[in-house]
Curated annotation (Swiss-Prot):
EC number of this enzyme: 2.3.1.181
Organism: Parabacteroides distasonis (strain ATCC 8503 / DSM 20701 / CIP 104284 / JCM 5825 / NCTC 11152)
Gene Ontology annotations of biological process type: protein modification process
Designated name of the protein: Octanoyltransferase
GO cellular component: cytoplasm
Family per record: Belongs to the LipB family.
Reaction(s) the record says it catalyses: octanoyl-[ACP] + L-lysyl-[protein] = N(6)-octanoyl-L-lysyl-[protein] + holo-[ACP] + H(+)
Secreted in keyword set: no
Molecular function terms from GO: lipoyl(octanoyl) transferase activity
Function: Catalyzes the transfer of endogenously produced octanoic acid from octanoyl-acyl-carrier-protein onto the lipoyl domains of lipoate-dependent enzymes. Lipoyl-ACP can also act as a substrate although octanoyl-ACP is likely to be the physiological substrate.
Amino acid sequence: MESFRYHDLGRIAYADALEYQTAAFEVLLDAKATGKKEDNQLFFCEHLPVLTIGKSGKDSNLLIPEETLRERGVSFYHINRGGDITYHGPGQITGYPVFDLEYWNLGLKQYIHMLEETIIRFLSLYDLKGERLEGATGVWLDPEVPGRARKICAIGVKSSRFVTMHGFALNINTDLSYFSLINPCGFTDKGVTSLAMELGVPQDFELAKSQLRSIFMEIFA
């Protein structure tokens, strides 16, 4: 029996995806409060261009006026996850695990570590060495090499009574030029990258989703 139900929302506006995961989050919270049984849920999607900023984020990390964003067709949301500002858009796998961590006897720190491990294992399929950066979340390449550290996957979550929402954003074929609009995750001295950038050619997006889903099933068995 699978430990979660998987949903591929396809390419979707941020607000619409937020409705899906918020509804699942509230159902799981209610189930915990009333003793009902509800399934954990994993949502994968690909967003239309959007910037989101977490509850600890600084507006100064948005480098252009919000009006200019709108003119460029980029949405902007303040949301209740951890972390600072990041970009979501086409070519990026955005994942929203709505999980009851008590199902796996996990704390929040362990959960984030397992999310990072999921991405690290995925990258190893492409002979890339994903690593953690001390004091930061997410998955990086060359995190300790001055001038070379670059993030390939951002992570920001919310947890209430050990039920999670929000999640990760993994750059596959992402247009990285959008990251020039922000200080990604609040960093001014580190870069961003994508699977396509590292390998030199666009990657099979559907294959990447399938591979990532399989690794989720292994790690969150």
